[in-house]
Amino acid sequence: MEDLSKITSNVSKVVDEATKEIREAVNSLEPPKIHLLNRRSTLNICAAVAVDTGQTLFGGILREVGVALFQVASSQENDEPKSYAFWVNPNLPEKERQAVIHARLDNLLSEDALVREFVKAMGWSKIYQDRVMPPSCYSSAPALSNFLRELLEWAKLYEVGKKLEQIRSLGTGIQPVLLRDGTLRFGHAQAGVDKPLGDLFHSLKVPILGIPKKSELLRNPVIVLWLSRYGVYAQGGPLMITIDTEMFKELGWRLERYFGDEESRTRFGRYALVRFDPLPSSRNLFAVDIPNFLISDLDETLVLLSGVAQQSTATSYPVPGYPIALRKVHDKVVFTEDKVYLLENSLRRSVPPEIYDFLKGLGL
């Protein structure tokens, strides 16, 4: 076995080199531009999500046989979750498999108004047409499942956005805002879908913000040390940090990956770092994706984010400062332990005996 002191020495040397490079990168950056989120605003904030809730049913057996169960809902009071079951992994020869997937997607398009309206608004004739659904969806169950989940989520966001636009047109003086749990992109569709997607939501005249719970950007040591060096965490109250991407471009960072840019074909937003949590010394920041059509208007952006901060939770779920609308809609669609128990028992009673025996043989 290699001498422990030698291992320690090698690791220490590499860590020292990495730390030196990180500090040099931080020293080359200008101070962050901090904007306090203290604007007056009255917002009607709504969120919408789609989640695959079938992964835990029957100990994951449904997932193993290729069945996805999606729950789709918005945070609006009277909007109950809607379920979609889909066979994402038909064990068939390649040509038959493709035909089955096409037939099921055609059926979804013809029977579901939510999906049909979104597909029509995007200018698609088929869900699986070229330059929309990736070829990997025919060979990979996770790829098809992820594509469908995002399709349903964006369709729901569009439906809610249209309703909010109608309310805005009444002239109530209350600004509607849409929230998405994630970046502003259709990440599991073909490249190029996001530009028309951004144009569609821009046409609604209802701002949309992407707020992922976690971000690779905020875990980057350069960003963490940069914020610490200039006392950002010690600031009191909600705040936003605008990012001068040219500084990071000079460091060799790929802007599209970390921040988004106006030429991006894979998303239609750009990051700002935002803390909704009002407590000083809080490190609970979010990388908020702000649409390209909004981020150039700093005053409007600050008004919207100030309103979101006013309606953010101070609890620890999932992190302090998480917007209440997103928490509310997640609570709607996630199956509690009691609901899982009731649903599993209901399925046991309703499926034909031969199907139950089949699932039981798989470990049900």
Write out the residue ranges for each language-model feature.
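Long, contiguous domain-sized segments
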Residues: 1-46, 53, 58, 85, ...
